[in-house]
Regions:
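Active-site-proximal, Lys/Arg-enriched surface segment
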Residues: 73-149
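Short, conserved catalytic/metal-binding motifs centered on acidic residues
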Residues: 45, 59-60, 68, 72, ...
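Electropositive, glycine- and tryptophan-enriched low-complexity nucleic-acid-binding patches
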Residues: 128-184, 268
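A short, flexible helix-boundary coil/loop motif
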Residues: 1-37, 52, 65, 224, ...
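Short, positively charged, Gly/Tyr-enriched micro-motifs
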Residues: 22-90, 103, 150-153, 187, ...
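Membrane-interface transmembrane-helix boundary segments in multi-pass integral membrane proteins
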Residues: 311-322
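An anionic, glycine-rich sequence signature occurring as long contiguous blocks
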Residues: 206-300, 304
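Domain-level cores of phosphate- or acyl-group-handling catalytic modules
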Residues: 165-223
């Protein structure tokens, strides 16, 4: 599905662009019957828009060897979400297992990515999810992801689109099913309070030990968290009902100690399935291993194109391309550039994700003939104004 450049000699911008094109261009895009274009032409526009963090319209406007933005979007509107998601996840898995040792167990984190959205739905109301106010809106397109942290960088394992009219647990199940197919053992599953859900907890603990941050909601949970001392206990979700779920609850007390201008006591609760041999504070320390997700989002934003289209599948495709580019960078950084040394490879600081994106941008702008001049007006400053200006 892709060929890693030769590790001898040098890795060039041309090499990076070629492998990015090799990875992204085959993504399934039905296209327009009778068109002289092929899917690769359209995906090059998307790649350039992503590494430039700009729109498809602006990308097409500024280059001579790309189709117009209307044609590009007409093609992208033919995307099939399920087929696109399936192939993209195969690629994410291929990248991940290029750099992850299958014989080493891993800590896997799952999370929702909310992409803020202004406007109405495209075809169905279920396309849009609700979120806390952000960027002047409370609606978003939502994606569920799973990742592991390797060499201090998050590697995306799986991603799926989340609809408002489906149970979020169904989306989580799709991601967990993909994670379960990886050849490495899973030591621990970590998730924030958005995954505090009976079905999610039941499914996750079947796969591995599970730690989920608990929201401070409900009188019984608030009573459990009303303490000044860390402790382990048992909690019954949906107590005395057919859906009742018992799980170990870790209640950890810590102190702000002036962090971010705050002080005093803070009490947090965690679902602690499979880690009851740990203290509540140790469970909290396990949960903090998911902190690498902020790095992932920061990198994704460096390669996420902009679009005003309401089509959720096109917006999802742009997010998938960003995730694939991020994983590809991790592969090239480790497999081609990092120098072997005792205890692991020496990861190069100079080959950053920004550099990776800059190289692709440079090569594609040359290939697609980025415009570097504009016709002058032939008039200049009127004589009367030139005289007044001295």
């Amino acid at each position: 599905m892709f060929n890693i450049p030769d590790p001898d000699g040098y890795l060039s911008a041309s090499d990076v662009k070629d492998v990015a094109e090799e990875v992204i261009a085959p993504l399934p895009l039905p296209g327009v019957e009778g068109s002289p274009l092929d899917p690769g032409d359209i995906w090059l526009v998307v790649i350039l828009a992503c590494v430039n963090q700009t729109s498809i319209w602006e990308t097409c406007k500024d280059t001579d060897e790309t189709p117009c933005d209307d044609t590009t979007l007409t093609w992208l509107h033919t995307l099939d979400r399920h087929w696109l998601e399936f192939v993209a996840n195969l690629l994410l898995g291929r990248f991940a297992m290029t750099i992850l040792d299958p014989d080493r167990s891993r800590i896997v984190s799952i999370d929702f990515i909310d992409n803020p959205y202004h406007g109405d739905h495209y075809a169905e109301e279920g396309e849009l999810c609700s979120m806390a106010p952000k960027d002047g809106t409370t609606t978003c397109h939502r994606y569920c992801t799973a990742y592991v942290v390797s060499n201090e960088k998050p590697v995306t394992l799986a991603m799926t689109y989340v609809r408002n009219d489906e149970d979020e647990a169904d989306a989580v199940e799709r991601v967990l099913a993909r994670v379960e197919n990886y050849p490495f053992e899973i030591d621990l599953l970590l998730a924030d309070s958005g995954f505090y859900n009976e079905r999610v907890i039941r499914r996750a603990r079947e796969i591995a030990a599970t730690v989920v941050h608990v929201p401070k909601k409900g009188e019984r949970m608030k009573d459990k968290l009303d303490t000044h001392k860390s402790y382990m206990t048992t909690y019954r979700m949906y107590k005395d009902s057919e859906r009742e779920l018992r799980f170990p609850l870790a209640v950890a007390v810590s102190y702000h100690a002036g962090d971010r201008g705050k002080s005093g006591e803070v009490v947090r609760g965690y679902v602690a399935c499979g880690v009851t041999d740990r203290s509540a504070k140790q469970v909290e320390r396990l949960y903090r291993k998911r902190s690498g997700i902020e790095t992932s989002y920061r990198l994704l934003r460096q390669a996420r194109g902009i679009t005003t289209t309401r089509d959720p599948v096109v917006r999802f495709a742009i997010m998938l391309v960003a995730a694939l580019l991020e994983n590809l960078w991790l592969v090239l950084r480790w497999a081609v550039v990092a120098r072997p040394r005792r205890g692991g490879r020496d990861l190069p600081e100079e080959f950053t994700f920004k550099t990776f994106c800059d190289w692709i941008r440079h090569e594609l702008e040359e290939q697609l003939r980025r415009q570097w001049k504009i016709k002058a007006n032939g008039v200049g400053v009127p004589a009367s104004q030139a005289a007044a200006a001295g």
